[in-house]
Amino acid sequence: MRQNTMTIIFIVFIVTFASLTIYGAEASEANFLERRADCLAHLKLCKKNKDCCSKKCSRRGTNPEQRCR
């Protein structure tokens, strides 16, 4: 009886841990996609030595300001 109880506790622990890990991964991915969508939609200005969206900044037209693609 004791082995059966320990096995059940172990299985519940593994399932709980796996569920929390999956939830954390989904939450971080959703947060990243949300930030990227906001940046792409508004074409925020790139700061010096930093890109707001991706690793590519390009100059557009005669205006020397840089915008994210």
From Swiss-Prot:
Keyword Signal: yes
Coiled coil: none
Entry keyword Plastid: no
Top-level taxon of the source organism: Eukaryota
Keywords on record: Calcium channel impairing toxin, Cleavage on pair of basic residues, Disulfide bond, Ion channel impairing toxin, Knottin, Neurotoxin, Ryanodine-sensitive calcium-release channel impairing toxin, Secreted, Signal, Toxin
Site (Essential for stimulation of [3H]ryanodine binding to RYR1): R67, R69
Subcellular location: Secreted
Positions of region (Essential for stimulation of [3H]ryanodine binding to RYR1): 59-60
InterPro entries: Scorpion_calcine (IPR012632)
Disulphide bonds in the chain: C39-C53, C46-C57, C52-C68
Alphabetical list of SUPFAM superfamilies matching this protein: omega toxin-like
Entry GO MF terms: calcium channel inhibitor activity; toxin activity
Role, per record: This toxin stabilizes ryanodine receptor 1 (RyR1) opening in a long-lasting subconductance state (55% of the full conductance state). Furthermore, it triggers calcium release from sarcoplasmic vesicles (45.3 nM are enough to induce a sharp release, and 50% of the total calcium is released after toxin (100 nM) addition) probably by acting as a cell-penetrating peptide (CPP). In addition, it has been shown to dose-dependently stimulate ryanodine binding to RyR1 (EC(50)=17.4 nM).
UniProt protein name: Intrepicalcin
Organism: Thorellius intrepidus
Source species taxonomy: Eukaryota, Metazoa, Ecdysozoa, Arthropoda, Chelicerata
